[in-house]
A protein has these predicted regions:
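P-loop NTP-binding core
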Residues: 1-269
Length: 269
């Protein structure tokens, strides 16, 4: 019997917080869904900011990604639709803080998430899975990267990032022993402000060091991007304007990502 086609899995990560990691995950996911693709978001960050933005905070007893992984179950029972057609989430809850401790003694602990994704009923109907990771290395991060085809690194243009990127690359190199197929999708420049010289310096430095790994689109500083999570909306919903700055930036970024992943758009939402 022919195996079901699995979606492309992308880990979104950076060891530094406050770089737009969750914002990038949420709005890229929405951008892909708006292009007619079916997208699954997985929240592995104990802060659960992605979950809050997409579906609100979970009650303490509601099942979430932690229970699915620890019980080695498919994700079917915890998947939730979001306010964007074609965009779903496997949410995080309070119990996620215990994930590393409970995974530690499991056999094949690096592959628990990969197995859960593969066992999820209907997973072949998804085109892309985006995983939001905590801003530090953990067993959750190892699971994410072991399950992924690509990794995407958001970098804020508000500070020079090279030391952090070198440390992250060391982590990736170690993980590639577990998942040799893991490849870089690219570096996404966030919080770009043309009025600040540091932003231009960061962009130039990264393009010099990493060449075409850096996406052409730069996500500009935008109060609406910062404000949309508190309203449980993506930038597309919050601006509700095809010419809005955030909408334009994330639409362009989404199209670049689709090009790198060789994804064709479906019926646009």
């Amino acid at each position: 019997m022919k195996a079901a086609k699995l979606p492309i899995v992308v880990s979104v990560l950076n060891h530094k917080g406050g770089v737009g990691k969750t914002t990038t995950t949420a709005n890229l996911g929405a951008g892909l869904a708006r292009q007619g693709l079916k997208v699954l978001l997985i929240d592995l960050d104990v802060q659960a900011n992605l979950t809050h933005q997409m579906v609100g905070d979970l009650e303490a007893n509601e099942p979430n990604i932690c229970e699915a992984l620890l019980e080695e179950k498919p994700l079917t029972s915890i998947l939730r639709p979001t306010g964007t057609k074609g965009l779903f989430i496997a949410p995080a809850g309070e119990s996620l803080i215990e994930l590393d401790l409970n995974l530690f003694n499991k056999f094949g602990r690096e592959y628990v998430l990969k197995n859960s994704i593969a066992q999820t009923e209907g997973i072949s109907s998804f085109d892309v899975v985006l995983i939001d990771n905590p801003p530090y290395i953990s067993l959750a991060t190892v699971n994410s990267l072991a399950a992924s085809d690509f990794y995407l690194v958001p970098v804020s243009c508000e500070y020079l990032p090279m030391m952090g990127l070198k440390y992250l690359q060391k982590t990736i190199s170690r993980i590639q022993k577990v998942n040799p197929a893991l490849k870089p999708l690219g570096v996404a420049l966030t919080m770009y402000d043309k009025r600040e010289s540091i932003g231009q310096s960061v962009a130039e430095l990264l393009r010099e060091e990493l060449a075409d790994q850096v996406f052409e689109t730069m996500i500009r500083v935008n109060t609406k991007i910062k404000g949309s999570p508190s309203t449980q909306q993506t930038i597309f919903q919050f601006e509700n304007d095809p010419k809005g700055r955030g909408t334009l930036d994330f639409t362009a970024f989404t199209q670049e990502v689709m090009g790198r992943l060789n994804l064709q758009k479906g019926a646009e939402v």
